[in-house]
From Swiss-Prot:
Name of protein: Adenosylcobinamide-GDP ribazoletransferase
Superkingdom, taxonomy of origin: Bacteria
Signal peptide residues on this chain, from the entry's feature table: none
Stored InterPro entries: CobS
Record-annotated membrane-spanning stretches: 31-51, 59-79, 102-122, 126-146, 167-187, 209-229
Keyword list, A-Z: Cell inner membrane, Cell membrane, Cobalamin biosynthesis, Magnesium, Membrane, Transferase, Transmembrane, Transmembrane helix
Gene Ontology biological process terms, A to Z: cobalamin biosynthetic process
Membership in a protein family: Belongs to the CobS family.
One MF term in the entry's GO annotations: adenosylcobinamide-GDP ribazoletransferase activity
Pfam families reported in the protein's UniProt record: CobS
Biological source species: Thermosipho africanus (strain TCF52B)
High-level lineage: Bacteria, Thermotogati, Thermotogota, Thermotogae, Thermotogales
Amino acid sequence: MIKNFLLSLSFISRLPLNINVNDFDRRVKKLPSFFPLVGYIVGSIYYLGALSNNLALKVFFLVLAFYFFDLFHFDGFLDTLDGFLNQSTKEKRLEIMSKGDVGPFAVFFGTLFVVVFWNLYLNANPFYFFISSTFGRYSMVLLMAFSKPAKKEGLGALFFPFEKKNLLISTIFTFFLIIFFKQYIISLTVTLITTYLISKIATSKIGGVTGDVLGGTCLFVNGLILLILEVV
């Protein structure tokens, strides 16, 4: 179990963990179970930064969390925007997403996300980052449960066929937050609705999900929960 958690941590982060296993193809299907636990780590870093009154420390923790955990999700978010918003065929959209070139949709909405996130980082309840980071990772598990892979290869396809028990285990791992009942229910509801809608959009646009869509969903749900918790 510990080795699977460490593999999960290394898989959805940039942490230089060298985990050697002989049965990776079997283990990789189990990694989504531990995604919410990774979220607790990310949330802790953002929490410490948001809690600090020192601007230099705030920036340090923000860079730390974003570089090691959220930067490649941000890349997926940008690629997904450019692909989904392109008025073309499924094949062309997948090609745009795989190239990774930054288009106008990615520039606009990516900048908007950064501006909103920075303002929330300065003003929102620091604990909300703990919640949003956990549910952001949980949303990737839900998206796998709701969807099918758009391609037969790539990072997203590694998790399919999806093992349903991953959804049960990952849901249980979110229960640590249930003591904050109101925020938990709001976050769970937002995650369920948003992830379901994204799965339908992804199926319509590209025939399923990719690694970019999974990462982009994580970041989008993370930011959306932060915003909603701060507003309500």
